[in-house]
Amino acid sequence: MKLILASNSRTRKEVLDKVGLIYSVAPSNIEEISTETNPDNYVMDLSKQKAEAVAKEQKEGVILSADSIIYIDDKKLEKPKTKEQAKEMLHKLSGRINYAVTGVTIIDLYQNKKITFNEVTEVYFDTLTEDEIDWYIENEQYIFERCGYSIAGKSAIYIPKINGDYYNILGMPISRVYKELNKLGYKLTDFD
């Protein structure tokens, strides 16, 4: 059985590697456009588009795709392109809760089944001083991270608590993915 990750995301691959899943990578390369405005529906729509694009190119396999966003005040936070944008985002996150939302789609070409779901994790941020924000911007590669922070990086010192799946913040809610694969009749060892 083949498991195909429809993503080139380094962190998603790391999560799958951690649990011992054997998979191949076939990124969808779609233009990520959705008319959905609700964060849950937005990520599910994009994950569906990615999985469907890859499924069209495959004869067999289980396609796994995901799309993630961070939002606060009902607004999606994008990757900062400049230090000024990163600083503005950190001010917005400071002392507040933000939400990591991941939409996941699994298309099982063996059984002709499709599952789409989303996971939400609350991320609590400490109140940051101006010095802490400046230090973070100088010492972290914020420019590569959606919303300017990575819980697996230096920003972990400013996140005292989360409510939900840690791996969801990394873009792959692996516990739920595993449960959904089980519902389809698969174990971790079924993929080669």
Describe the predicted segments one by one.
Residues 24-32:
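A short beta-strand-loop structural module common to alpha/beta enzyme folds
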